[in-house]
């Protein structure tokens, strides 16, 4: 069935407009609660959130909706998305709920869910919830109503989990790290994780006010981190996004490394330690240079649809552990069930400390192909798939690039945008081809 509310990463939108309203959040939680109770007499869910001011409102509405369906609730407060996933599993909860719009501005928010195993839920589950939303509510009797309480020291429990993924024989003593938490969910947790492992920590983007999440800081605005690393003469810079599930790194020279490069580094580190790495999963957007570099070392490479949930699904299908996206979502399934910016950072820092190699030394064999990504805003009713001129232009560009580049055109799963990506060894050629395709895409006909 076609989904009305769920996108590629839960439900997301502008606060105060459907579906990100308190009345819908209550209805949603009630519907989810009814779905849970079909298999479990007394479900218990965890609810975590980032630092957006609207999180209070949505948290209360979700709590009421679950309780009204006879579901118990445990409130975690501000906590990274992967922290909610971890605690859902650790607390043996039925479901984990995250209130966050990830890297979006404060005026957006969203709601997403984790299974009892701490993994993203399949499309079929979301469709079952959407069906339940079309049905009349069935309010639980007073004696059957759910209860709500707060989990003490949720942040501390997650901090210990993150530290447990770092080799106990190693330390970060003598390493200076600038940490940028994007004024988001990891604003207290991230500095503590690195500090407790011995690092000298400089914190930026760690003063949320409810309105400044992701504003000129974090993984979507790494310029501030680059400047801070240089100014503080730090060894590394760690950039997270608002819910801390993605990671970008900066080295001592101020060079920025994206998720594609870090995925290669994670694989290369394991190979250097004698571990088997049969393959890694990227996405349709993963830079060709990473694919070439991995295959040159005997590591298979498969592309999934864009979105960490699809990378995860492909990893399970292949039986592999490593995957990721250029945006910084990285998966190491032997460490965590979902993408985790802090855990990923610790794996990379561990590789550097253990080997004595810098980020640039680890990645000297990976020269990323120039990749141009243009966003074309579509007007309501425009159907780019019926644009025959775009189809013809795309085929022409593919013929021009041959084996030295790629073209990818896809609709955003969270915004009314068409993403046009062209990758080529020649940057000027990539820019010219992308501009050509974007121009044609703007004239897409009405549906």
UniProtKB/Swiss-Prot annotation:
<dbReference type="GO" id="GO:0008966">
    <property type="term" value="F:phosphoglucosamine mutase activity"/>
</dbReference>
<keyword id="KW-0413">Isomerase</keyword>
<dbReference type="GO" id="GO:0009252">
    <property type="term" value="P:peptidoglycan biosynthetic process"/>
</dbReference>
<dbReference type="InterPro" id="IPR005845">
    <property type="entry name" value="A-D-PHexomutase_a/b/a-II"/>
</dbReference>
<dbReference type="GO" id="GO:0005975">
    <property type="term" value="P:carbohydrate metabolic process"/>
</dbReference>
<comment type="similarity">
    <text>Belongs to the phosphohexose mutase family.</text>
</comment>
<dbReference type="Pfam" id="PF02878">
    <property type="entry name" value="PGM_PMM_I"/>
</dbReference>
<dbReference type="GO" id="GO:0004615">
    <property type="term" value="F:phosphomannomutase activity"/>
</dbReference>
<feature type="binding site">
    <location>
        <position position="241"/>
    </location>
    <ligand>
        <name>Mg(2+)</name>
    </ligand>
</feature>
<dbReference type="InterPro" id="IPR036900">
    <property type="entry name" value="A-D-PHexomutase_C_sf"/>
</dbReference>
<feature type="modified residue" description="Phosphoserine">
    <location>
        <position position="102"/>
    </location>
</feature>
<protein>
    <recommendedName>
        <fullName>Phosphoglucosamine mutase</fullName>
        <ecNumber>5.4.2.10</ecNumber>
    </recommendedName>
</protein>
<keyword id="KW-0460">Magnesium</keyword>
<dbReference type="InterPro" id="IPR005844">
    <property type="entry name" value="A-D-PHexomutase_a/b/a-I"/>
</dbReference>
<dbReference type="InterPro" id="IPR005843">
    <property type="entry name" value="A-D-PHexomutase_C"/>
</dbReference>
<dbReference type="InterPro" id="IPR016066">
    <property type="entry name" value="A-D-PHexomutase_CS"/>
</dbReference>
<dbReference type="GO" id="GO:0000287">
    <property type="term" value="F:magnesium ion binding"/>
</dbReference>
<dbReference type="InterPro" id="IPR016055">
    <property type="entry name" value="A-D-PHexomutase_a/b/a-I/II/III"/>
</dbReference>
<feature type="active site" description="Phosphoserine intermediate">
    <location>
        <position position="102"/>
    </location>
</feature>
<dbReference type="InterPro" id="IPR006352">
    <property type="entry name" value="GlmM_bact"/>
</dbReference>
<dbReference type="Pfam" id="PF02880">
    <property type="entry name" value="PGM_PMM_III"/>
</dbReference>
<keyword id="KW-0479">Metal-binding</keyword>
<dbReference type="GO" id="GO:0005829">
    <property type="term" value="C:cytosol"/>
</dbReference>
<dbReference type="InterPro" id="IPR005846">
    <property type="entry name" value="A-D-PHexomutase_a/b/a-III"/>
</dbReference>
<feature type="binding site" description="via phosphate group">
    <location>
        <position position="102"/>
    </location>
    <ligand>
        <name>Mg(2+)</name>
    </ligand>
</feature>
<dbReference type="GO" id="GO:0006048">
    <property type="term" value="P:UDP-N-acetylglucosamine biosynthetic process"/>
</dbReference>
<dbReference type="InterPro" id="IPR005841">
    <property type="entry name" value="Alpha-D-phosphohexomutase_SF"/>
</dbReference>
<feature type="binding site">
    <location>
        <position position="245"/>
    </location>
    <ligand>
        <name>Mg(2+)</name>
    </ligand>
</feature>
<dbReference type="Pfam" id="PF00408">
    <property type="entry name" value="PGM_PMM_IV"/>
</dbReference>
<dbReference type="InterPro" id="IPR050060">
    <property type="entry name" value="Phosphoglucosamine_mutase"/>
</dbReference>
<feature type="binding site">
    <location>
        <position position="243"/>
    </location>
    <ligand>
        <name>Mg(2+)</name>
    </ligand>
</feature>
<dbReference type="Pfam" id="PF02879">
    <property type="entry name" value="PGM_PMM_II"/>
</dbReference>
<comment type="function">
    <text>Catalyzes the conversion of glucosamine-6-phosphate to glucosamine-1-phosphate.</text>
</comment>
<keyword id="KW-0597">Phosphoprotein</keyword>
